[in-house]
Regions:
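Active-site nucleotide/adenylate-binding loops and adjacent lid/helix of ATP-dependent enzymes
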Residues: 2-141
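ATP-dependent carboxylate activation and anion-phosphoryl transfer catalytic cores
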Residues: 58, 106-107, 116-229
């Protein structure tokens, strides 16, 4: 049995669920307005542009962009959306990462973090993860049909944005409700946080967090602010 820690382990462990890795297929299954590069949007608005597949994670290539239904010719000729990427309607709201455990035939939330971005101009760079009581969102029946050991789902408010066939909130296991986890980004100033507990990355090899140059923001670890209330 393969020990599933990262998404590439899940790809090998659960070949029957590899469609979950296809973020475009997931978006369409959820009923969102979405399409691949080469297909025009049907309405004006902001969209999230992402690779169809990104088992590495960390928001590689993801960005927010305004697209117009008047750009049909341009978009059909691969302008605005890179090949291998897709567009999906943009959802405002709070970003949640929720871990689930299997109870009978259902997935039940067991822990959760709320992610706060520094800016919507950079979807990789979270400013803070806050440990919260897990919210209960209604999941589609087909999500409950996914039979794996662990499940992590990311949301914008109650809208599913990603499903991972593994746990995602390991930091919750050693934290309490109200604790705040601050990612430490290379080049940023954290003088005001140096009194806090520092939690290093799982791997000590910095190259593991550069995605071979595909990430310009390199995470060095975390500072944890304990909730004392």
């Amino acid at each position: 049995m393969i020990e599933v820690i990262d998404d590439y382990h899940a790809w090998e462990a659960y070949p029957q669920y590899r469609w979950v890795f296809n973020k475009l297929e997931l978006s369409l299954r959820l009923g969102y307005h979405a399409g691949p590069a080469g297909i025009p949007v049907k309405k004006d608005g902001y969209y999230i542009i992402r690779p169809v597949y990104n088992p590495y994670g960390m928001g590689i290539g993801a960005h927010k962009k305004w697209l117009s239904s008047d750009w049909q010719d341009d978009m059909s000729n691969h302008k605005h959306i890179p090949t291998g990427y897709f567009w999906c309607e943009w959802f405002d709201g709070k970003h949640y990462s929720i871990d689930y455990k299997r109870v009978g035939d259902l997935w039940i939330p067991i822990n959760a973090c709320q992610g706060l971005h520094k800016t919507e101009d950079n979807l990789t760079k979270f400013d803070c993860w806050r440990i919260i009581h897990p919210p209960y969102f209604l999941l589609p029946n087909w999500v409950h049909d996914i039979d794996v050991d662990e499940l992590n789902i990311e949301f914008k408010d109650d809208k599913i944005t990603e499903i991972h066939l593994r746990s995602g909130n390991d930091i919750c296991l050693v934290s309490n409700i109200g604790d705040e986890i601050y990612p430490v980004w290379q080049g940023d100033d954290y003088t005001d946080m140096q009194h806090l507990e520092f939690i290093p990355n799982l791997s000590q090899d910095e190259e593991d967090y550069t995605a071979a140059g595909n990430l310009k923001d390199i995470r060095l670890g975390y500072y944890r602010k304990i909730n004392t209330q």
